[in-house]
Amino acid sequence: YEEPANLLKQELREPAIYNAIIKAIAEGASRMNDIKLKVGEEYSVVSKYLKTLIALGIVKKETPITEKPGKKTIYLLADHFFRFWYRFVPANSSAIDSGRIAKTYPYAVKKHLSGYMGLVFEKMCQDYLFYYADDLPVELNEIGQWWGTDSNKKRQIQIDLVGAPAEGKDYIIGSCKYKNEKIGMDELELLREYASVFGKGSRYYYYIFSKAGFT
């Protein structure tokens, strides 16, 4: 079960630093400064190793859709196998080695799956829209996340799904919720607030995806 770690040992020098970077991202560090602090290396070192991981397709760099790369850039694990492994396996290696993982799974893994599955579910929702692109009210150019600052309420916001048009200013704004609770009208109202902060469209079409359904 140690294939990801063994792969790094075979392919890369100093695998410990690569392991530390991947583990930091898997545990939620997405900005360069956060990754640097978790890894304990200088900016130049982390940046160099990140470039290699990006070239290998293990890590990807993302910027809010419709914006140029800059301070808002974040780093995510592009390979979901690596993402799952580094999120759950090292922390539970003792249980795996001793054959206790079936007993520890409910609280060591299962209770955290909704949080882990969030990004996976978002990708599924993006793929769904692309698959049914001919039926959408907007001719899509690209789909991605958007995040930024709501200056009126002094808060950071994130829109799970933004469909940018090939031309014009009609946008799709979406929410993707992988939770056990049903979603109500308050989620639509929140999306409308977020769309006004996004502010790049003249018309918005709202799509809400929910694992548990709707109230």
Task: Specify the residue positions occupied by each region the protein language model found.
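A cross-kingdom feature that marks ATP-driven nucleic-acid transaction machinery
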Residues: 73-215
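Interdomain hinge/linker elements that couple catalytic modules in large macromolecular machines
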Residues: 1-82, 87
